[in-house]
Swiss-Prot record:
Pfam families: HATPase_c_3, HSP90
Compartment(s): Cytoplasm
Alphabetized InterPro entries for the sequence: HATPase_C_sf, Heat_shock_protein_90_CS, HSP90_C, Hsp90_fam, Hsp90_N, Ribosomal_Su5_D2-typ_SF
Function field: Molecular chaperone. Has ATPase activity.
GO cellular component: cytoplasm
Segments for region (A): 1-337
Organism: Actinobacillus pleuropneumoniae serotype 5b (strain L20)
CDD domains xrefs: HATPase_Hsp90-like (cd16927)
Keywords, comma-separated and alphabetical: ATP-binding, Chaperone, Cytoplasm, Nucleotide-binding, Stress response
Gene coding for it: htpG
Protein name, UniProt field: Chaperone protein HtpG
Length: 625
């Protein structure tokens, strides 16, 4: 009998998620059982951990398990566990709301593309709500370990749910699915065995199914519980015994991802330290990858006992996309997040796991370029953070980077620094790069003209973080990285000696013109000079090596920080007819208008915008009129 009953409305995000999920995931509806068994397994893990300090929570029943049963007459399927259970407040928090920051933004990002939405929802993690894919009503009966009051939760998956106090003799949770008429296929022992074998064989505790016993005459004589999975934690088994399918299903259990992982590494270390690690590289970025409030990390086990989810201290922030677990014998069972932060063992494990993760990415890049490209497209921006965070592994991290390049004529980031170095021209001493707002802007930059003419490859960097990256990554494989937008650009042995001699002569010829232009601009530009880097364009702007670049100034602005004003060097192409024409002008007003127009054009090419575009248009119309 139930008491203290109340009906509550779902959080709006839950209602939206339920509707989207039911329609988007229906083609793979059997995953509901994987999700519910996975939740039951987590509940058992949490009880084991809490019982370390309070064994009375076992209530005399320390044999933890998950049980699956069905009733053909009632049309119900029940998943039961004797894990940690929930009290009334926890039921409302966990089943009536989604306690994930950014949920609203995530749901708003979903559109009408069902295939795409199903992938996104899979990344979000469907969990308990997957029950509504096959059920038109779900009943939950639960009692928290160590408490006497049990709770009933019930909903048809629409606008509201009911919660009430009930009696329940045993701790743990029963999830009862009232199946839709068209979903009665799941009221079959054979079908349930098939699904559990496929998705939950790796669960580290017994999954039992209610089966019929038969006597010697072949007649049904009663019901019994039969264990139908291996019930051995997958990571404790030998690698040789585990199939790829089992590794992938364990990944989905661990991460609640809807997709297979790209690659994994399963390692057991013995000696000074003893631990087992199982690391996975996902194929799709989680929707909250850039949410700083969201914890990302490995599952931590100590001596096979679950301790915590998202133990972020074992992976650096730039590897926060890695999924997996660590099972160690070297930490105490009562370890806390605070203890982990200050622990020498933690630091040693973190260094080892970081190295293992980077080696895994190197293996993926070497063995399967297509899969690595998938990884890079999803997680490249995050990995780039590593050159500023992890000095010890900087070169190894940089070797994993991929860039667009003038060599490939494509915006796809496929070129590694090793590829570039391998193609460097004889006499070339630097790795040349260009940063811009977009690939199109980079590809069409006038700064490339000389390099295109000489056939020198340039890396085209257009991610917002790239300017920060090259600030930390000054060399690779002994070769300095050099921006081609710097005023003191040095081509070394690749320079054209004849052109340099010609330019010296032109310097004398254009001397008074340069002084005149410098006088007009005054403090607005650092200096006005002739340049050898242009072939088709009359002018560009550049910055000195010690000056903040345009892209860095934009990065500051995007973060809401005030950046120092960028002072440019104004470089003019003495072979361009427009420059020659302006140099010959004697009318001061016309000279000022034309030189200003050239400067504005150069600024527009460099920055993509002007502070006063209306004045630019007015000036251009005046000169064209």
């Amino acid at each position: 009998m139930s008491t203290n009953q109340e009906t509550r409305g779902f959080q709006s995000e839950v209602k939206q998620l339920l509707q989207l999920m039911i329609h988007s995931l229906y083609s793979n509806k059997e995953i509901f059982l994987r999700e519910l068994i996975s939740n039951a397994s987590d509940a058992a893990d949490k009880l084991r951990f809490k019982a370390l300090s309070n064994p009375a929570l076992y209530e005399g029943d320390g044999e933890l398990r998950v049980r699956v049963s069905f009733d053909e007459t009632l049309g119900t399927l029940t998943i039961s566990d004797n894990g940690i259970g929930m009290n009334r407040e926890q039921v409302i928090d966990h089943l009536g709301t989604i306690a994930k920051s950014g949920t609203k933004e995530f749901l708003n990002s979903l559109g009408t593309d069902q295939a795409k939405d199903s992938q996104l929802i899979g990344q979000f993690g469907v969990g308990f709500y997957s029950a509504f894919i096959v059920a038109d009503k779900v009943t939950v009966k639960t009692r928290a370990a160590g408490e006497t009051q049990a709770v009933l939760w019930e909903s048809a998956g629409e606008g509201d749910y009911t919660v009430a106090d009930i009696e329940k003799a045993t701790r743990g949770t029963d999830v009862i699915l009232h199946l839709r008429e068209e979903e009665k296929e799941f009221l079959s022992e054979w079908r349930l065995r098939e699904i559990i074998g496929k998705y939950s064989d790796h669960i580290g505790l017994p999954v039992e199914i209610q089966t019929t016993e038969y006597n010697e005459e072949g007649k049904a004589s009663g019901q019994k519980w039969e264990k139908i999975n291996k019930a051995q934690a997958l990571w404790t088994r030998s690698k040789n015994e585990i199939s790829d399918e089992e590794y992938q299903e364990f990944y989905k259990h661990l991460s609640h991802d809807y997709n297979d992982s790209l690659i994994w590494a399963h390692n057991k270390v013995e000696g000074k330290q003893e631990y087992t690690s199982l690391l996975y590289v996902p194929a799709k970025a989680p929707w909250d990858l850039f949410n700083r409030d969201q914890k990302h990390g490995l599952k931590l086990y100590v001596q096979r006992v679950f301790i915590m989810d998202d133990a972020e201290v074992f992976m650096p922030n730039y590897l926060r996309f890695m999924r997996g677990l660590l099972d160690t014998n070297d930490l105490p069972l009562n370890v806390s997040r605070e203890i982990l932060q200050e622990n020498k063992i933690t630091a040693s494990l973190r260094a080892a796991l970081t190295k293992r993760a980077l080696q895994l990415l190197e293996k993926l890049a070497k063995d399967d370029q297509a899969k690595y490209q998938t990884f890079w497209n999803e997680f490249g921006l995050v990995l780039k953070e590593g050159v500023g965070e992890d000095f010890a592994n900087k070169q190894q991290i940089a070797s994993l980077f991929r860039f667009a390049s003038t060599q490939t004529d494509s915006s796809e980031q496929t070129v590694s620094l090793a590829d570039y170095v391998g193609r460097m021209k004889e006499g070339q001493k630097a790795i040349y790069f260009l940063t811009a707002d977009s690939y199109v802007a980079a590809k069409n930059s006038p700064h490339l003209e000389l390099f295109n003419k000489k056939g020198i490859e340039v890396l085209l960097l257009s991610d917002r973080i790239d300017e920060w990256v090259v600030g930390h990554l000054t060399e690779f494989d002994g070769k300095p990285l050099q921006s081609i937008t710097k005023s003191d650009l040095d081509l070394g042995d690749l320079a054209d000696k004849e052109q340099e001699e010609s330019q010296k002569a032109q310097q004398a010829e254009f001397g008074s013109f340069l002084e005149r232009a410098q006088s007009y601009f005054g403090e607005r530009v650092k200096k006005v000079v002739l340049t050898h880097r242009l072939t088709d364009t009359p002018a560009v702007v550049s910055t000195d090596n010690d000056e903040m670049t345009t892209q860095m100034a934009k990065l500051f602005a995007a973060m809401g920080q005030k950046a120092p004003e960028v002072k440019y060097t104004f470089e003019l192409n003495p072979d361009h007819r427009m420059v020659k024409k302006i140099a010959d002008l004697t009318d001061e007003t016309k000279f000022n208008d034309w030189i200003e127009l050239l400067f504005e054009q150069a600024l527009l090419a460099e920055r993509g915008s002007l502070e006063n575009p209306a004045a630019f248009i007015k000036r251009m119309n005046k000169l064209l009129g």
